[in-house]
Amino acid sequence: MAISPRDEQNRSVDLWFAYKVPKLTKDADSDSASGYEYVYYDRQVGAVQKSPNLMNDPKGALFYTLDSVFGDPGDTTGWILYNDEMPADANRSNNATLGHTKGVIAFDIASSSALWLLHSWPKYASPSVPGVPTPLYGQTFLCLSLDLATAGKLAAQMALHQQPQVYLPRTGGLDHTSPLYALTQPLNASAPGDSDSLDFKTRGGVPFKVIAKNRKWGKDFWNDLVGPTLKADMYVETWIRGKIPPVLDSDGVHKTYDIKFIDLRKLGAPWAWPETQDHAKWGITTTDNWVCVGDINRMVTQEKRGGGTIAFQDPKLWKALCETDLIIPPPGKTDAQARAMIRKTHEPAE
């Protein structure tokens, strides 16, 4: 069977993006939320929209996509699941030396098709245990269609750089020389500490770039790699629970600022929350329409973990994440005051 992302109506689609809302209590800035509501985007829809579905319902893009893979797999269908916090049915302990990475690569050898779901949700996904994990925090999801050869190239990059913690793989008859098969085997702990940028296209021809680093690289991923690779300043939303790298990167040119408040109300979704309730890992450049969806945080401790992000130029999604005030001031503050607050988080007083 052909493998591809599925949209909100269970139709094959080239790519989609979703942003899950955290569990929220109603206040002056936001409606309450169960933690399973989300906004959704694909290029056919053409705009970021509030989904009528919930992520813990048996419908919607995330459910339909994984159900099409796990529900009734053929003999030549397989998958590679990876997460730095594995679900309980993986039945083994997490290895903190492996990558801070989360996702699913699914493939079908007979149809030479594949998909890649990169997300930020711990303990997800499981092929045998239905349901979804904690609703507490905001999470991001990006799902792309691939051909089998491209999936193999991405797997080869992962083995050297992101070094994901793989669990419950199904090889689907892969040749043992395949990079996909190699990713299901123990990884090379002596791989050199470096970074990488790999260009690829979806089956629909949309160009993407995977930017990744090995745990031995020893620098801040967002500040010293993503910004310089894209040649732009960035605003980044990640999980921050520790010391943060400086704004200015090592080349002394590009800056990375941390988002402090997220508001979906201008997208027609009645929710807003501070970054302390968000576990997503995404960023946007200040110019050139670059959107990044990844799985590694902007903290000093993450310099010792492998990880990556998928970067792509999408003016509509970029505009939704930027110009519609997802990066907005807390209540009572202007945009200028909000950006000053973000800068003050990192830059010492003069």
From Swiss-Prot:
It is an enzyme of class 3 (hydrolase). One of its GO terms (molecular function) is deoxyribonuclease II activity. It comes from the Bacteria. Its EC number is 3.1.-.-. The keyword Thylakoid does not apply. It holds the Pfam family DNase_II. The keyword Transcription regulation does not apply. Keywords: Endonuclease, Hydrolase, Nuclease. Unlike their eukaryotic orthologs the putative Burkholderia deoxyribonuclease-2 are probably not secreted from the cell, as they do not have a signal sequence. Belongs to the DNase II family. PANTHER family: DEOXYRIBONUCLEASE II. This is Putative deoxyribonuclease-2.
